[in-house]
Every structure is written in C-alpha cells, then in structure tokens.
C-alpha cells in the first residue's frame, strides 16, 4: 500500500468532472446518452453490491470494486467492455487486492442464481479470468484505492459526534453510486458526508469545520451533489433502479462485448 493518499497512484489519477462526464464514442454511436451512461453505472454498482452480499465480503471490497468499475469507463467503452462482465470481474479483482479473495466459480454460481432469467448476465469462469487481464491493463495496474471510511471515523471522533457514525457511514456508501471517488480526495468526501449528517441531525459543528481550515465551498458542493443525487434518482435500497428505467438502456449494449 502507498504510504499515504497524497503520494498514491489514486491521488495522481483524480479526474475533473468533465473528464468523468464523457460518453465514449463507441457508446455514443449506439445512441447512449450521458444520462443513460450514468444509469448503467448506477445499475451495475448496485449489481456489484448485490453480488457481494451473496459472497459475503467487506464493504471495503465492494467500494474498491465499484471504484475500479467506474475508473474503467473513463478509459473504455461499454460497447467494448461489457459492464455485465466487468462488474463481477471488478469484484473478483478487488477481493484479491483487499485480501478477501472470492473464487471465480463462486461468483459465477451466484450470478447464475441471481440472473437466472437473463442470459446476458451469465458468464463462465474463463470469461472472468480473461476480463481480469483486460481490466488490469485498462487500470494501468494501479490497484490501490483510498476510501472515505477511515477518515470518516477519525473526523467524527475529532468532532465529538460519533453518535452519527452509522448515519454518515450510510451516506458514504451511497457516494459509490456516483463518481465522487474518481474526482475528490476521500477525506473531502468524508467531510461532505459529515456535513450532511450534521445538518440533517441538527448537530451544530460550524466551529469545528472552521478550525479544520478546509475549503467549505468544496465541501458544500460535494454535499449538494450527493443531495441532488438522492433527489434525482430515488433509488430503492434493496431493488436498485426500476426495471422500466434501466432495461431500455441495457438493451442498447451488445449482448457480448
């Protein structure tokens, strides 16, 4: 692991919003809009989460897998790299990187169980192993990911509001349905989640924020992005996006990339 975030490959790979909000040409040619591109990423992030619940891995593994997934599509198209295969492969790769290895055959078993009615999601072990090699290359073999969870706990402790831990942790989990981890340092995401939690739970920590000497404009902007996301998508925490919303988009993708 890198000594700290500021010297890590993760830090060096942070992107601007406009770099993330780009639809690859191959996907654009298939009629996929920027909003639809986002919908697929939300849908497949949820798919990773559901699959992870089946194989019982830690939240950190899920977060790393989703980060890989989102990072891949800043470089590759969904037409070329089928998200239905990339998603479980990212979970497989993340489980190894985070030292909670899940066997590929177990992922294949649960995918077939979860997606019994949709052949487009069903892949074999060799498909995952082959895609793993492609993903490693697409990620430039930079696999270290820093997450907001550790700074969140440290900052909540420092602010004296550890009673908000569960609530703020849930908000951090939800940020992985967005691209924030590709754009902002993890501690800034943590601060935004604390800011939201403190406002919604009527905890006045204004002085604490002032003592931190962070750019509150950035913290508030991230907070607004998160709140806007909640307001725009209204995702069912158990079911994800409605089928009638995501199916037409997924149908624009080739069956096998």
Curated annotation (Swiss-Prot):
GO molecular function, one term: cyclin-dependent protein serine/threonine kinase regulator activity
Keyword Flavoprotein belongs to the record: no
SUPFAM superfamilies associated with the record: Cyclin-like
Record's keyword terms, sorted: Cell cycle, Cell division, Cyclin
Coiled coil: none
GO biological process terms on file: cell division; positive regulation of transcription by RNA polymerase II
Cross-referenced SMART domains: CYCLIN (SM00385)
One protein family per Pfam: Cyclin_N
InterPro entries: Cyclin-like_dom, Cyclin-like_sf, Cyclin/Ssn8, Cyclin_N
GO cellular component, one term: mediator complex
PANTHER family tied to this protein: CYCLIN
The family this protein is said to belong to: Belongs to the cyclin family. Cyclin C subfamily.
Protein name, per record: Cyclin-C1-1
Origin species: Oryza sativa subsp. japonica (Rice)
Lineage per the UniProt record: Eukaryota, Viridiplantae, Streptophyta, Embryophyta, Tracheophyta
